[in-house]
C-alpha cells in the first residue's frame, strides 16, 4: 500500500495556485514535514518534492496506516470471539459424540448378549476404534454392525409387520415435522447470521467513518472545522500526536474558512455519533448472544430427538424379543389356547355337517336331472303346439285378406251397375211421360173419329156423349149408363109383354090376336115405307147436322190439344237433344274409359310392383318368423336357464340354511369371545392406566416443549424486530456520520429504501410483523404460519388477501433460497 502511494506521489504534478484559492483536492503539508522532506538523498530528485503542497503527505500516509491497523485490530477481536465460540461448540460436539459413542457401544453389547450374535468381532472393533479414525472406515464398520443386527432380528420370531409399518409411518411423519421445524429454524438462523454479518459490516464502516471523522488532518483536507482540544478519543481512535503535527499548516490555511461558532455544534454531533455507535454495538452483541442461545436450543432439540429415537429402538427390540415365560403367562397366549380348542371343536362339527350336505347335494342333483328332462319335454311339446297354432292363424289371415279384396272388387262393380240402372230408369221415366202424352192425344183423336162415325151413322146420343166426355172413363161411364137405361127399358117391355100374354086366351084367342096384330104390323110397314123416304131425308139432314156438330167438337178438341201436342213435341225434342248429349257424354265416357284403362294399366303395373313389394314383405315376414322362431328357441333356453337358476336358488336357500346354522355357531363363538374379551378388558384397563400415566407425562413434556418453542419463536420475532431497529439506528448513524458526502448519502438512502422495500415484500401482508413462510396453492398467496394456523384452527379457511376458500392440504411451506 505504501509503495503504491509513493508511486502515485512520484507521478503527481506541482500546484501552481496560491493559498488564497481556497481548499483543494490535493493534500497540504505543514512546515515540519516540508523541512524533513527538503533533504533528499537522491541527486536526481527534482524540485517537485520541495513544493508546499506535498509537505503533509508523510503525515497523511502514517495516519492512514494507523487507521488500517486499528481496523485490523477490531477485525482480530471479532475473529477471536468467533474462534472462541467455535471452540466451545467443538467441545460440546465432541462431548456429545463421546456420549453417543458410549451409548452405541452399550447398545451393541446388550444386543450381542441378548441375541447371541456369532460375529462378536464386529462389535469389538467398535469399542476399540479411535474417535479420530478414518470416516470411511467408521461408516463401513457401522454398516457391518447394522447388517449383523438386522440378520439376527430377522432370524427371531414373527414380527407384527403392520404395527411396525404404522410406527414407521408415524416416526416418518414426526421426522418430517422435525425436519420442517429444523429447516425453518435454520432459515431463521441464516437470516439472523446474514443480518449479523450486514450489521457487523455496517459497524466496521461506521467505526471507520468515526475514525476518519476524528482525524483533524482529513477534516482540514476536506475543509471541515477541527475537533476541539478537550475531546476524548477512545483506544480505537488515531493517536493525538499525528494531530499535533498536522495542526501548524492546516489551521493556518483553514482559519479564514472555518466559522467561529462551529466548535459547540461539532462536539454535539460527535457525542451523538458516539452514542449511536455504542447502541449499535450493544444491539450487535445482543443479537450475537440471542443467535448463540438459539443455536444451543437447536442442538438441545436435536439431542432430544436422538434420545427419543434410541428409546423407540429399545422399545421395538423389547417388543420383538419377549421371553417365553412372559408369553406363556400373557393373556393373549391363554386366549389363543382357548381359541384353538374351540376351533378344533368347530372343525369336527363342520366335518359332520359337510358329510350331511354332500348326501343332500347328491339327492338334489338326481332330482334336478329328472325335473330338467320333464320340463324340457313339456317345453318342446308346447312349442310345437304354438308353432301349429301360429301357422293356422297365418293361413286364416291370408284367406281373409283375399276374401276382403274380392268383396271390395265386387262391391265396386255392383256400384257401377247400379249407377247404369239408375240412369236407364231416368231415361225410361222420360219416355213413359212422353208416351202417356201421346196416348192422351191418340185417345182424343179416337174420340173425334168416333164422333165422326157416330155422326155418319146418325147417332146423336153417341155424338153428344163423345162431345161432352172428356176422357175414355167419362165415355165408358156414359155408355154404361145408357146400357143400363136400355136394359131397364127392355125389362120393362118384357114385363109389359108378359102381362099382355097373360091377359089373352091361351089357344085361339091368342092366335087370332097374333094374326090381327100381324096384319096391323103389315099395315104399319106399308105406311112406314111410304114414310121412309121422308125419314131418310130427315135422317140425312140429321146426319149432316151431327157431322157438323162433330166437326165443330173436333176443331175445338184440336185447338185444345194443340198446346199439348206442342208440349209433347218439346219433350220429344228435348229428349232427342238429351240423346245427343248422351251420345257425346258416351263418347266422353269412352275417352275417359280409355284414360281410365291407361290408368288401370298403370295401376296394374303399380299393383304388380306392390305385389313384388308384398312378396318382399312376405319374405321379410318369413325371416321375421324365422327370427321369432329363434326367439322362441332363445326363450326356451332362457326357460332352461330359469330352471337352472331355480336350482341355484334352491342351493342358495340351502346355503342360507347353512349360514343360519353358521350364525348360530357364530353366536356361540361370540359368547366365548365375549368371555375372553371381558378377561382381556380387565388387563387392558390396567394397561390403560399405565399408558394414561405415561401419556400424561408425554403430554406435559410436549406442552412444555411447545411453550418453550413458542417462547423461542416470540424471542426470535422480538430479536428480529430489535435487529430491524438496530439496522435503522445504524442507518441513521451512518447517515449522520457521512452527512457531508452527498453522493454517498444518496446511495445509502437508495440502499436503505430498497432494503425497506425488500423487507416489506418478505413480511407477512396480514400481520406486518413476521416473515412469509407459508404458501396457499389455491391462489398462490404467501403469509406467515401463525396467521394461517389461526385461520385453520378457527375454521375461517379463507385467504386474507383474496378471500378464496382453501383446505388444509392447500397449505404448503414456502422455501426462499
Swiss-Prot record:
Catalytic activity of the protein: S-ubiquitinyl-[E2 ubiquitin-conjugating enzyme]-L-cysteine + [acceptor protein]-L-lysine = [E2 ubiquitin-conjugating enzyme]-L-cysteine + N(6)-ubiquitinyl-[acceptor protein]-L-lysine
Cellular localisation: Nucleus
Gene Ontology BP, a term: chromatin organization
First-level EC class: transferase
UniProt feature, compositional bias: Polar residues: 502-512
Zinc finger (RING-type): 764-803
InterPro entries: E3_ubiquit_lig_Bre1, Znf_C3HC4_RING-type, Znf_RING, Znf_RING/FYVE/PHD, Znf_RING_CS
Renumbered residue ranges of the record's region Disordered: 1-48, 497-534, 730-750
Gene Ontology molecular function, alphabetical: ubiquitin protein ligase activity; zinc ion binding
Disulfide bonds: none
Coiled-coil blocks: 160-222, 265-505, 532-579, 658-739
Protein keywords: Chromatin regulator, Coiled coil, Metal-binding, Nucleus, Transferase, Ubl conjugation pathway, Zinc, Zinc-finger
Enzyme Commission (EC) number: 2.3.2.27
Compositionally biased spans, kind Basic and acidic residues: 21-33, 514-529
Pathway annotation from the record: Protein modification; protein ubiquitination
Highest rank taxon of the organism: Eukaryota
CDD domains with a match to the protein in the record: RING-HC_Bre1-like
GO terms for cellular component: HULC complex; nucleus
PANTHER family linked to this entry: E3 UBIQUITIN-PROTEIN LIGASE BRE1, RING FINGER PROTEIN-RELATED
Function, as annotated: E3 ubiquitin-protein ligase that mediates monoubiquitination of histone H2B to form H2BK123ub1. H2BK123ub1 gives a specific tag for epigenetic transcriptional activation and is also a prerequisite for H3K4me and H3K79me formation.
Protein family: Belongs to the BRE1 family.
Protein name (record): E3 ubiquitin-protein ligase BRE1
Source organism: Mycosarcoma maydis
Taxonomic lineage: Eukaryota, Fungi, Dikarya, Basidiomycota, Ustilaginomycotina
